[in-house]
Each structure stands twice: as structure tokens, then as C-alpha cells.
């Protein structure tokens, strides 16, 4: 269930935490409730939980207008987006054209902007939209070519599957702090936040909307005041450990890509009273090895 549900490839995506999130929902009697992501990005984890029946609704928010435009196109312009996926040529010439559209950032044409974002995500190295080169290089002399991650029918299928859940997917385009403050009193008691801010280190190289130290502190101040249970995931750096020092912190072994075996360590921070699996609390959690017990 946790694999390949999102049409986007996203750096630092947390789909690999699907089993962990499902267990947290179950152990805290939050199943079939609402699930909230202030930083939607690729939405892989949120969609996996929705498709798996672990939550009834997901609230996804992203400040980046290009990312928001893509998700808005899935929910509100499904067939038009599917036709673009099926018919647009995947060539270097088209890559240049789509990059110009994305860089223009015309939010008055969300389908055009959303598709450009999607096109670059599927054709750029590692799915990095900002400042990344095209797969295979402009000369296309690399081992992999521009279209190697652009399986039209599979991607169209994913888009149509998501659209079937449109009435249970709530999309916003707000600053994450503003979003959390506005939604916290509106969601039901059985709700869980999964908060995955831009990395503290190297965030500027991965995200359009990256944070400086003050912004990270602003986020933590808001998170610590939330009424509902939450988990926060971050790169494991001392600065983040310091600003969340009043909450429990655990190191997680994370698989950064489904296709590779590269594993790194990230920090998980949990709200007061949230029950966590012993693999997390005892420091033995490895995402690739963790499963949902019956």
C-alpha cells in the first residue's frame, strides 16, 4: 500500500513511514479520523493512509503555488491533466518549455502550472524541481534518458485513483503556521498531524520554500501549542533538538528511496502522551523492517 501511490517523486518524502504512522493511529485510537500534513509535497504518506483505510480524510497544505496547482489539478481538472500526461511529448525541447512555464509561476492558470511542475518532477534528477538538471543531461548521453521516470499510463492511473477520493481530500495553499493555527480548532478530536518541515540543513537546495533559523523556531512555537496529537520529522541536527527539547525525541533509520537501499538517520519528535511503538522508543526502528502487526 505504501509504494508508488503519488504521481510525484519527492526529496525527503516520508512514504517509508507508512507502517509506523498506521500503528501510531491504531495504538492511539485515531484510526478512521483525520490526518493533517502542513507540508504536503508529494503526499505519499497521506495518500497511503487514506487508501489503506486508516484515516477517513486528509488535509494537505502546501505554500508552494506550483505544488498546490498540481494537486488542485488532480482534484478539479482530472481529465484535462490525464490528457496532458498521455499526450505531451517527453523531449528536451518540451522540458525547456515546461521549465519556462514553471519559472513564470502563473497561478491564474493552475492546470498549466501544475502540469509543468509535474513534468519537471518526473524528468529532473531525483525529482528536484528547483535548479536540478534533466535526467540524462541536455545531450541525452547519460545511461538514463529524460523519459525513464515518465510512465504515462501508470501516472495517469495514479492521478485518476486520487481523484476518486476528492471529497475526502482537503487542499489548501497557506503558510504552514497559518494553516495549523486555522485548522486546529476545526478538525475532530480523532486527528493526527504529521509535520515534515523543510530540512534545517541543505533545505535551500531541495525546496522552493526553505526556512532560516527564525522560521524553524516559529514553526516549533506553533507545533508545541497544538491541541491535537502530532509527530514531527526532521533532519537530525542539534539546532532542531534544541528548539524541541521539551518533547520526546527519537532517531529513525529512514529509507530515502524505494528503488535504492540508501538509509539515513532522521529525528522524530512526538507530542505529549502519544503512544509510540517500542521499536521507536528503544531506538531500534528501521523503516524498511517495520511492519503493521495484526
Per-region residue spans from a language model:
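A structural signal for isolated positions on well-ordered beta-strands in alpha/beta enzyme cores
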Residues: 59, 170, 229-231
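Class I S-adenosyl-L-methionine
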Residues: 1-54, 174-192, 199-294
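Non-catalytic surface loops within mature trypsin-like serine protease
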Residues: 65, 122, 271-273
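Conserved S-adenosyl-L-methionine
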Residues: 31-93
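A short helix-to-beta-strand connector/capping loop
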Residues: 54-56, 164-169, 245
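SAM-dependent nucleic-acid methyltransferase catalytic core
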Residues: 2-23, 30, 74-194, 198-204, ...
Amino acid at each position: 500500500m505504501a509504494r508508488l501511490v503519488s504521481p510525484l517523486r519527492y526529496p525527503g518524502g516520508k512514504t517509508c513511514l507508512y507502517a509506523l504512522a498506521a500503528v501510531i493511529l491504531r495504538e492511539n485510537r485515531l484510526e478512521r479520523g483525520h490526518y493533517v500534513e502542513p507540508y504536503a509535497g508529494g503526499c505519499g504518506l497521506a495518500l497511503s493512509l487514506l487508501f489503506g483505510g486508516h484515516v477517513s480524510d486528509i488535509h494537505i497544505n502546501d505554500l508552494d503555488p506550483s505544488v498546490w496547482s498540481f494537486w488542485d489539478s488532480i482534484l478539479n481538472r482530472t481529465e484535462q491533466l490525464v490528457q496532458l500526461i498521455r499526450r505531451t511529448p517527453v523531449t528536451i525541447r518540451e522540458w525547456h518549455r515546461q521549465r519556462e512555464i514553471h519559472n513564470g509561476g502563473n497561478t491564474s492558470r493552475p492546470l498549466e502550472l501544475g502540469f509543468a511542475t509535474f513534468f519537471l518532477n518526473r524528468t529532473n534528477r531525483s525529482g528536484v524541481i528547483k535548479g536540478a538538471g534533466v535526467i540524462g543531461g541536455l545531450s541525452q548521453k547519460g545511461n538514463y534518458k529524460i523519459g525513464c521516470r515518465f510512465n504515462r499510463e501508470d501516472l495517469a492511473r495514479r492521478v485518476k485513483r486520487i481523484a476518486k477520493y476528492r471529497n475526502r481530500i482537503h487542499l489548501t495553499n497557506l503558510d504552514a503556521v497559518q494553516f495549523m493555527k486555522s485548522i486546529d480548532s476545526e478538525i475532530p478530536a480523532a486527528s493526527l498531524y504529521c509535520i515534515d518541515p523543510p530540512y534545517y540543513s541543505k533545505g535551500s537546495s531541495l525546496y522552493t520554500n526553505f526556512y532560516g533559523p527564525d522560521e524553524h523556531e516559529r514553526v516549533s512555537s506553533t507545533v508545541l501549542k497544538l491541541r491535537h496529537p502530532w509527530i514531527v520529522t526532521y533532519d537530525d541536527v542539534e539546532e532542531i533538538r534544541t528548539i524541541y527539547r521539551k518533547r520526546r525525541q527519537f532517531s529513525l533509520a529512514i529509507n530515502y528511496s524505494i528503488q535504492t537501499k540508501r538509509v539515513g538517520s532522521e529525528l522524530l519528535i512526538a507530542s505529549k502522551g502519544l503512544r509510540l511503538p517500542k521499536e521507536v522508543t528503544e531506538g531500534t526502528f528501521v523503516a524498511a523492517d517495520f511492519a503493521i502487526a495484526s
